[in-house]
Amino acid sequence: MTSYRNGPDAKGLFGRFGGQYVAETLMPLILDLAREYEKAKDDPAFQEELAYFQRDYVGRPSPLYFAERLTEHCGGAKIYLKREELNHTGAHKINNCIGQILLARRMGKKRIIAETGAGMHGVATATVAARFGLQCVIYMGTTDIDRQQANVFRMKLLGAEVIPVTAGTGTLKDAMNEALRDWVTNVDSTFYLIGTVAGPHPYPAMVRDFQAVIGKETREQLAEKEGRLPDSLVACIGGGSNAMGLFHPFLDDAGVQIVGVEAAGHGIDTGKHAASLNGGVPGVLHGNRTFLLQDADGQIIDAHSISAGLDYPGIGPEHAWLHDTGRVEYTSITDDEALEAFHTCCRLEGIIPALESSHALAEVFKRAPSLPKEHIMVVNLSGRGDKDMQTVMHHMQQESKA
């Protein structure tokens, strides 16, 4: 059987997706980074230090929790939550940041830059930069700054400089463009800490590997609790790192159904969504070839989602490839469906999920009722919802007016 876990190839390609579409000035740096990462991967001292920080700083392993009340509510499949929201900084983002900051230090870089949408990757990057005493600059779109004030303040508290990006719609895509510009001009001193499984090779593979701790733990924890593999896995997808982290260790287990959930915003047919696989076409953005939201002239269309973390017009190249091969099923959930799932999880489990994770929960609530009681579903609760209070309050006020 051909493995789904061998990618990317030497050129950083997953089938027809991925690659290294960057400015010539960045090419030596990218190749150097790929070499350093391969070395670090095989270095027991690096892995040991990574394991130490994952355990004592991040708080891993994160629990795999049987959601008894949600299971009863759906009346079908047995629902488990992988509790990534309990990590230090409140989401899965820190898994990748700890890995990359150790790599940056190993490469002698003194300045860290990153892009952020919901602010969670920005907070996680500022956190690890503070811990290792490195200068930190975060690029964030003005639209996202407005809807994520608390996270902006957190980043500043942690010593990071937050640079507002006014270009475009002032969201994640624009922040990433600015970060790439910065990197080109400060190649020698600067390490670009990308927050998702996108960007030029080696980033998609590197971020996936640092996030794969999610899926590895899930395998072990479920073996302990149920003595077997799950029947299905569900995770939300913006760029797709929390999903890739859960999915990757299970890709070669044919009996495990895998479902990625994109943001359908107001609905795919309205054009106001962030579902690159369900509503996009292949193209090149931010250093890699993948599915993108584009108009007839190939211009990138602005994505929309109630959740700032899913509001990206592309998707990681490995997801694009898994979609091509049919190994993973990709669906989408609207803003309203995600909000409903958010409220259900709050009321029934006493857990306030991020709006991103609520998209995955909504998909679970659609599927679980028609599945047998012995069917085991694992959903990645990728982050906590503290950052989304303003958005949810605003929505509830709008609804009460209507």
From Swiss-Prot:
Q: Which family does it belong to?
A: Belongs to the TrpB family.
Q: Name one GO cellular component term.
A: cytoplasm
One GO MF term, please?
tryptophan synthase activity
Needed co-factor(s): pyridoxal 5'-phosphate
Task: Give the record's pathway.
Answer: Amino-acid biosynthesis; L-tryptophan biosynthesis; L-tryptophan from chorismate: step 5/5
* Complex formation: Tetramer of two alpha and two beta chains.
User: What are the GO BP annotations of this UniProt entry?
Assistant: L-tryptophan biosynthetic process
Q: What is this protein called?
A: Tryptophan synthase beta chain
Against Pfam families, the record matches this protein to: PALP
Q: Which UniProt keywords apply?
A: Amino-acid biosynthesis, Aromatic amino acid biosynthesis, Lyase, Pyridoxal phosphate, Tryptophan biosynthesis
Q: Which reaction does it catalyse?
A: (1S,2R)-1-C-(indol-3-yl)glycerol 3-phosphate + L-serine = D-glyceraldehyde 3-phosphate + L-tryptophan + H2O
InterPro entries in UniProt: Trp_synth_b_CS (IPR006653), Trp_synth_beta (IPR006654), Trp_synth_beta/beta-like (IPR023026), TrpB-like_PALP (IPR001926), TrpB-like_PALP_sf (IPR036052)
Q: What is its EC number?
A: 4.2.1.20
Q: What does this protein do?
A: The beta subunit is responsible for the synthesis of L-tryptophan from indole and L-serine.
Q: Which residues carry this modification: N6-(pyridoxal phosphate)lysine?
A: 93
Which HAMAP family does this UniProt record tie to the protein? Trp_synth_beta (MF_00133)
